[in-house]
């Protein structure tokens, strides 16, 4: 953006700050009302996805040992930033899985937050630059392994979930047969334009009630004036204690302030964010 435009935008931001002073994000953007899901959520099936999202954090040997019987598993080498993926192919039922692990360093969510407007000529939507770069590495790894006509299921946790969503977008453009995709504790990857274009994807996002990572990156007034703020797409299931959960047909507004959390991201523990905590919550939903 040119410096003069930035100055004008800066003046507008000051005006907006004056207008919105004292208002919370929930007051600016009223949260949607939880609804009944179109069909009952099969938490046993969701747990299957979450366990794969956990497995990708293990060693290659453990991944192969714990893969489904009769499945073929191909594992990517980890990148210097820790991004890794594996493809699990089951020829008997013609199902293939793409499981993505992102970097374990949450501070990387803050890196390269600028939108990259042309990540791939097929997408043409703004994306979080860091997530897009990770997703492209995974995409180039998996695209030669996927078998035509097989149902393709995509999953990932945290930053791996963010990369998994972008991989899902790319696979849609390839005409791949997509099965249900599920992510856990996934941060935002695109803006309103991207959300509108890809909201028909078979994506279901799971969020622990006190996990702030899915609220990242937070609302920023500069982004309101540029490409627009980061925004989720796909229904959201907020996991509460015990058997409690709420279903939202779209992302709900921020449940709590994340400004201070964003400033110290990567420097503190987040008890509700680890994949083990998601698995524990899902097990409670099915009585384990």
Give the predicted meaning of each segment.
Residues 11-22:
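Bacterial N-terminal signal peptides
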Residues 2-12:
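Bacterial N-terminal signal peptides that target proteins for export
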Residues 26-155, 159-288:
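Non-catalytic, mobile gating and regulatory segments of ester bond hydrolases
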